[in-house]
Amino acid sequence: MLKSTWSWRLAAPLATCVALAALLAAPTRVTAREKPPLARTAPLFEFHSNFWVNLHQVLFHEAWLRAGKPVRGLQSAAPLSAAGMSSQDEADWRAAVSFYAAHFANRQQHGDDQLIQINDDLAGQPDNGARLSPPDLPPELIAVLHRAAGVYRRYWWPAHDESNEHWIASQAQRLQHLGPGLAAAMTKDLHQQWPAAPIRVDVCHYVVALGYALTTLPPHITFSSSDPFNPGLDRFELLFHEASHTFADTTMNALETEGRAQHKDVGDLWHSLLFYTSGVELRRLLPASEQATFTPYGYRNRVYGGGHWPAYRRVLEADWQPYLDGKIDFTDAIHSMVADLP
């Protein structure tokens, strides 16, 4: 049996990474009591199309399909298939999917230490023909991945890798033109700096669920290159929304402290605030021709539509927006949002 939890480990960077140098510029709004952050010299993100992470994510996706999971959490409603597969290849692939279905089909990547560890460990494995060597992965999982690797490489990996590289290239121009300003604005808004090292982004053909996943120790985003639900600017905005989880502690702590002082449950207000902030700041940076048609991800996808989130939207629009507009300070915005929660 696989262990239920594994220790965290920093995945080693790949020599073949694709780094896009989007450097931080000075903030667009600085008050008298705020100093602009030092100019950033490291890239914001480091992009990879890693064979082993892609294989793992594909098998996880196939396992969800076999279990009949909702299509909204998947990028395709049909299992992978290929003409001319040998009977041995079919048997090897079915065995790998069966293993994943037995161990992972009823689990989510978000918050699952074991799945996080698998993804992080595989991200440190180069595709150089050598056998997998992460010390924290159990031998039975390594054996399954090795058995499936040849099948995946023969039938699907070339097309998936091409799709991933196209996705990475599609973000390059926007990162160059919008990335520095968006990162500067969001870190200023949240009173916390971007991580010192570039955030690793593993681009995969499939990512369960919703087409993206994030872990913060270390910062690591996994993003689908084929997700039909996140087209165009949604992808770019989501990239920065996910990144903002890595510099949200100051805001989260401020909300929780104010909530205790006012005897209010602030719940997931911090998370709705991240969606709201990335949308507002991205719109401000877009050319006028795009601003007119741009709808932030949170609104377009009805993120604020269920549970306590309609109330979060109201306090964000009433109390956080004036802060983003420079009309009130951070402390007043935090106090007002909590006070206006039901």
Short names for language-model regions:
Residues F236-N253:
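Active-site recognition of the HExxH zinc-binding catalytic motif
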Residues F294-P342:
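Pan-zinc metallopeptidase signature
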Residues P13-A25:
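Bacterial N-terminal signal peptides
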Residues V30-A32:
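Boundary at the C-terminal end of the N-terminal hydrophobic targeting segment
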Residues M1-W8:
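N-terminal secretory signal peptides that target proteins for export/translocation
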Residues A159-T216:
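Auxiliary, metal-adjacent structural segments of Zn-dependent hydrolase domains
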Residues F223-L239:
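Short pre-active-site segment immediately N-terminal to the catalytic Zn-binding motif
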Residues E34-H110, A123, T251-M252, G259-Y312:
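Post-HExxH zinc-binding segment in Zn-dependent metallohydrolases
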